[in-house]
Amino acid sequence: MLSAVKMDLYRMRKTRSFWGVLIAMILFTVWSVAMTKMDTELPDTAQTQEAEEQTEDELFIGIGVTVEDTQQNPLTAADEIYAHFSSKLPCIFICIFAVMFSVADFHTGFIKTIGGQVEKRGYLIISKGAALAVFTAIATVLETAAILAASWICFPGIRLGAGGELAVYLAVQFLQGTALAWIIMAFAVLTRSSVVSVSVAVCLCVNIQTIFYSGLNRMVQRLAGDDFDITKYTVTGNIFYLPMDPAGSDLARCILTAAVFMAAALAAGIAAVHRRDI
């Protein structure tokens, strides 16, 4: 088992996609922070209206990195970090790499060769999950560093604006990013199609699923008369809704939801490699 994890980590580090995705993520993040610089130069009323529109729409379709810099609420580096992670911008790159890393073995025949040499085929999925968790950790650290560096360049004298709560926020977002990567890994293993898996990943990251969620929410609210919102029990929903200073109930819900989806994704992937010819 440990040998399989070490092998996947080594192969991951040697792939071009590993470096290509990380470099693309960093460049896109720097560009995004530079664009928020332009947003903050808008009049205060325009910034406030834009922020309110996203808040009212809640989980909107698309990716929006919106910050507010006014005299009453001066922009901090923590605001930039929150805006980027809650938008699921880094998640797109994490999911793209998850697809490329998971499907590549089926195309090259590597998994067929190594599959007969391991005691249990499920170890192949667990090792890939471990490698993707490491990649998500690296992406989280690099994303945060890129945001901080770009913020200090674009906004000279900007304050961090957060301490211990930022570390907790990033830790939970790392867990949820790993859960999303494992979900996409399961799709890739089940379909063995890069096109299908990337399409699912993009749809999840830009919130296409909210069309279905909104209908389900209305149906439950009509039957139970309760203010129910299923998005708060999904990984993508919690990535968006998690506040910078989360309460204990928010942390518990996010961690439990991520754990359930991670277990389900691993189970689906393991079942796929056991029942199908690899």
Segments the model singles out, each with a brief description of its role:
Residues 213-231:
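Extracellular/periplasmic helix-loop junction at the C-terminal end of a transmembrane helix
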Residues 98-117, 121-122, 129:
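Transmembrane helix boundary and interhelical loop/hinge segments in multi-pass membrane proteins
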Residues 1-26:
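Aromatic- and glycine-rich beta-strand/loop motifs that create alpha-glucan
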Residues 18, 22-101, 125-192, 201, ...:
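Secretory targeting signals
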Residues 15-16, 119-120, 192-194:
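Short loop-to-helix capping motifs
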Residues 11, 260-278:
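Junction motif at the cytosolic side of a transmembrane helix
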